[in-house]
Structure formats: C-alpha cells, structure tokens
Swiss-Prot record:
Function: Catalyzes the complex heterocyclic radical-mediated conversion of 6-carboxy-5,6,7,8-tetrahydropterin (CPH4) to 7-carboxy-7-deazaguanine (CDG), a step common to the biosynthetic pathways of all 7-deazapurine-containing compounds.
Lyase keyword on record: yes
One term of GO molecular function: carbon-nitrogen lyase activity
GO BP: any one term: queuosine biosynthetic process
Co-factor note (free text): Binds 1 [4Fe-4S] cluster. The cluster is coordinated with 3 cysteines and an exchangeable S-adenosyl-L-methionine. Binds 1 S-adenosyl-L-methionine per subunit.
Top EC class of this enzyme: lyase
Originating species: Flavobacterium psychrophilum (strain ATCC 49511 / DSM 21280 / CIP 103535 / JIP02/86)
All copies of domain Radical SAM core, residue ranges: 31-210
Positions bound to S-adenosyl-L-methionine: 86, 127-129
Protein name: 7-carboxy-7-deazaguanine synthase
InterPro entries per record: 7-CO-7-deazaguanine_synth-like, Aldolase_TIM, rSAM
SUPFAM superfamilies: Radical SAM enzymes
Alphabetic keyword roster: 4Fe-4S, Iron, Iron-sulfur, Lyase, Magnesium, Metal-binding, Queuosine biosynthesis, S-adenosyl-L-methionine
Length: 210
C-alpha cells in the first residue's frame, strides 16, 4: 500500500512506476539501428492480447521511483532516451521530460496514444490499438505511425489510422512477432503496392538484445 505522500508524488510525476531501464539498440521503426536508453514505465489498461510485455500492465508491481533518479541514470548513456511501457501516458510525463531535456537529451516516446498527451517530445511514435483508440492530439503530433499487423484485417485498420494522422507522419507496418512468418510476406507485398508505407522489423529480437 502506497503512502499518501508517494501517491501524490506519482500523480504529479515526481515519481513513476519504473519497470525497467536499459541501454540498447533501437529495434523498430524510424530509428532502427541507433543507440538509445529505454525507460519502461509500468501500467497499461489497453490490453492487447498479443502484448510481449504483459508484465508491465499492473503498475502496482513496479515500485514508484523518483524521477530525478530515473534521469540521473539516463544521463550515463546515450543522448537519445525512449520512454515506453506499458502505456507511459497513463502518467503525467511533464516532469520527466522537462528534466531529461534539461540534460540536453533527445526524448522519444512509444505510445498507443490512448491517453491525453503530457510531456514535451522530440519524437512521438504512435502505435494505435483497436481496443482503445488514440486521442485527437496524438494523431496531430505523431512523427511516426507504427501499426502492428496480427492478421489481414489489420491492414484495413492501418489505413483507417493513416487517414487520421498528420500528413508528415512516417508510416510503418510491423508484424506481431508470433505471426512474423505468416504475415511478413503480406506486409512486403502490401508495402510494394502501397509505397507510402514502410516495413518495420523487430530487429532487436533477431539480434537477441533487449
């Protein structure tokens, strides 16, 4: 049971339920192949059945950590920070992003966009989910739209989402990992016939890195 003081700190973004943090090579989307420090925040109620980090869903399993400590750890590694989850926008990201930027770090987010946008982001990767669609602002500010393809019906969803996102967003299709053998050929064919899209692969899993 969290104390009232800790609950207030979490609500303000002075503390966040930190699941894990690690330095690695980005494996997906526009920044594939570049070094980045990942901050994974616990808590998500979007509930994708194919989620590969279901252990992140219950925020209560991840101890509230002072934002200053998270930032101090991040400064030891790359100049690019990726905030992911879970669903990081479940929480107020204002304090975290302010303090990361004060250290002259580039701050990226990977989000479903299902919650109001807080924080200041240098790169906003929107990965929408059918269960809980993005808020309007997420479509407006997204630098990158990454749609996960689990079955052929997801191509329809991808086009629906592409129609909502701003015209400058870069569009990616990425197979759900357990379906990669089945769906990747369809994705390749789709991108060749619809070249506004790009293929995203989970290269970190091929490289066996976090």
């Amino acid at each position: 049971m969290l104390t009232k003081e800790i609950q207030i700190a979490v609500e303000k973004g002075e503390m966040l339920p930190l699941m894990e943090e690690f330095y690695t090579i980005q494996g997906e989307g526009y920044h594939t192949g570049t070094a980045a420090y990942f901050i994974r925040i616990g808590g998500c109620d979007v509930g994708c059945h194919w989620c590969d980090v279901k252990e992140s869903w219950n925020a209560a399993l991840h101890p509230p950590t002072k934002t200053d400590v998270i930032v101090e750890n991040a400064t030891k590694y790359a100049k690019t920070i990726v905030v992911t989850g879970g669903e990081p926008l479940t929480w107020d990201m204002t304090v975290l992003t302010q303090r990361l930027k004060a250290e002259n770090l580039q701050v990226h987010i990977e989000t479903s966009g299902a919650y109001p946008v807080t924080g200041a982001w240098d790169w906003f990767c929107l990965s929408p989910k059918k269960n809980k669609l993005p808020v309007a602002e997420a479509y407006e500010i997204a630098h990158e739209l990454k749609v996960i393809i689990y079955n052929k019906h997801d191509f329809i969803f991808a086009e629906e989402q592409a129609a909502k996102v701003n015209k400058n967003a870069i569009l990616f299709l990425q197979s759900e990992w357990s379906k990669k053998e089945e769906m990747t050929p369809f994705i390749v064919d789709y991108v060749m016939n619809n070249p506004k899209w790009r293929v995203s692969l989970q290269t970190h899993k091929y490289l066996n890195i976090p």
